[in-house]
Amino acid sequence: MSFTPGKQSSSRASSGNRSGNGILKWADQSDQSRNVQTRGRRAQPKQTATSQQPSGGNVVPYYSWFSGITQFQKGKEFEFAEGQGVPIAPGVPATEAKGYWYRHNRRSFKTRDGNQRQLLPRWYFYYLGTGPHAKDQYGTDIDGVFWVASNQADVNTPADILDRDPSSDEAIPTRFPPGTVLPQGYYIEGSGRSAPNSRSTSRASSRASSAGSRSRANSGNRTPTSGVTPDMADQIVSLVLAKLGKDATKPQQVTKQTAKEIRQKILNKPRQKRSPNKQCTVQQCFGKRGPNQNFGGGEMLKLGTSDPQFPILAELAPTAGAFFFGSRLELAKVQNLSGNLDEPQKDVYELRYNGAIRFDSTLSGFETIMKVLNENLNAYQQQDGMMNMSPKPQRQRGQKNGQGENDNISVAAPKSRVQQNKSRELTAEDISLLKKMDEPYTEDTSEI
């Protein structure tokens, strides 16, 4: 049983060139067809698959089922990782996802200064056993051929795929499975990245792609068939950097004025929308640590969300839905302590919440999370203990080491015998005093 790519989704198309009958045609893969009038434009001669290009470049003798991949940066290799690189085609099972990418060397064009510039190549995909290298075995070292296959495909047998008839089958926009890494410096035809910037540019590009057109405007209208020139990437980078007024090679420096502006911008936000960082610390955003705000210690108080350990904690943070629907909420009106007395007072409310975040040891990074939590929960208690310790006496200016230390030492008075708790025998005087204390008190009535 032979498979036809896109059989069940032939209506899918991209932004490539279309003829009047709805068949998708690419710049280097146009078939013999009648001239079609389009919106006031004169009919353009169509290039066939077997016609020779007078300005260089090889023709594509076979029609690919997919749109091409065009190179726009010089020196970039066309390659895919193992098991990747086969385009998605509805109706084709994974066992038939095998083939190769064929490099098409495109034509050259004349620049305004009269020099010839060669367009960068474009690659087309063909299933194994089809296309210009239908008779070659998978993996054969051929210049301009890159072999690709899925992990489920048997590369020892050709793919059971029919050849594409351009008169009845549309070319499928190239798409890849999720996780596919595209070659750097290439873009997919029809993806919109190479769309011309204006109608005049589109017309000039259409005229340049017609090999049989003899009547052209001046040479200034000659542009590449693709809207992307080889040096366009460098031009885009230069324009972006010029727009930003920055140099990408230089790291951005944060001055005191910049840090102050960043801090003020953060503090102007509502309390629940602030994100502390190096320029605006945790205490500046939310106040000192205590029983009600008991998280944070050490470097995390200084760096805030910039701390390298914070992202793993952010994975525990609840979503907005979990916050509202998974917590106990209470609305309370509080006293407004801000503003002057002569200003109109505003009603201030607090939305108080109580909830919990549950996780177990199967959570990714569990050990690291527990370590960070243990280091930062109630860390203020340890810091307060260190602050309550007697600080080291500071030496005043003009004093040498050791000088003045004895002046700060308070000399206690010697203890009495009672404080010393020493035992002694009673004397005769002591016994006499004790007897007088036992006698009854008599008031002296004698007159003077």
From Swiss-Prot:
Biased amino acid composition, Polar residues: 29-38, 45-55, 399-409
Residue numbers spanned by region RNA-binding: 52-194
Location of the CoV N NTD domain: 61-190
Record localization: Virion; Host endoplasmic reticulum-Golgi intermediate compartment; Host Golgi apparatus
Keyword RNA-binding applies: yes
Signal peptide interval: none
Record-given protein name: Nucleoprotein
Residue numbers spanned by region Disordered: 1-55, 157-231, 385-448
Annotated family: Belongs to the betacoronavirus nucleocapsid protein family.
Subunit structure: Homooligomer. Both monomeric and oligomeric forms interact with RNA. Interacts with protein M. Interacts with NSP3; this interaction serves to tether the genome to the newly translated replicase-transcriptase complex at a very early stage of infection.
UniProt cross-references to CDD domains, sorted A to Z: CoV_N-CTD, CoV_N-NTD
Principal subcellular localisation of the protein: virion
Compositional bias per record (Basic and acidic residues), positions renumbered to this chain: 422-439
Regions of compositional bias (Low complexity) in chain numbering: 9-22, 193-223
Protein's job: Packages the positive strand viral genome RNA into a helical ribonucleocapsid (RNP) and plays a fundamental role during virion assembly through its interactions with the viral genome and membrane protein M. Plays an important role in enhancing the efficiency of subgenomic viral RNA transcription as well as viral replication.
InterPro entries xref list: N_prot_C_CoV, N_prot_N_CoV, NCAP_bCoV, Nucleocap_CoV, Nucleocapsid_C, Nucleocapsid_N
Spans through the membrane: none
Modification Phosphothreonine occurs at: 174, 427
Region listing for Dimerization, in residue ranges: 266-384
